């Protein structure tokens, strides 16, 4: 009986330690939601105004322009596209340049 109780307590302790140690990291969407919620609270928005603000904020239409997050591939594509535009490349030359530029990052 004592062994069963001891084993049960041991498993319980291990379980609680594991649950407590697993710090939950927020996803980018959850971070954006928290940020937008704090901004809406600071502006004392209520009702439809808050709902509209939250919707726009989560879509990044009212947040800071640099806050919109791009994937590394999208960033590289934007850089290569800007370089191709600066060099006034068109057609097949542009396609070759873009292909080579995007492969450099990989």
From Swiss-Prot:
Pfam families: PsiF_repeat. This is Phosphate starvation-inducible protein PsiF. Residues 70-89 have a biased composition (Polar residues). Residues 1-20 form the signal peptide. Residues 58-92 are annotated as: Disordered. Keywords: Signal. It comes from the Bacteria. It comes from Escherichia coli (strain K12).
């Amino acid at each position: 009986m004592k062994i069963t109780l001891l084993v049960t307590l041991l498993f319980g302790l291990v379980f609680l330690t594991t649950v407590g140690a697993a710090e939950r990291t927020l996803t980018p969407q959850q971070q954006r939601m928290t940020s937008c919620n704090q901004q809406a609270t600071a502006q004392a928005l209520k009702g439809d105004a808050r709902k509209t603000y939250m919707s726009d904020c989560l879509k990044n239409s009212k947040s800071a322009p640099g806050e919109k997050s791009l994937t590394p591939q999208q960033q590289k594509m934007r850089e290569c596209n800007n370089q191709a535009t600066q060099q006034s490349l068109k057609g097949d030359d542009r396609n070759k340049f873009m292909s080579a530029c995007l492969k450099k990052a990989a």
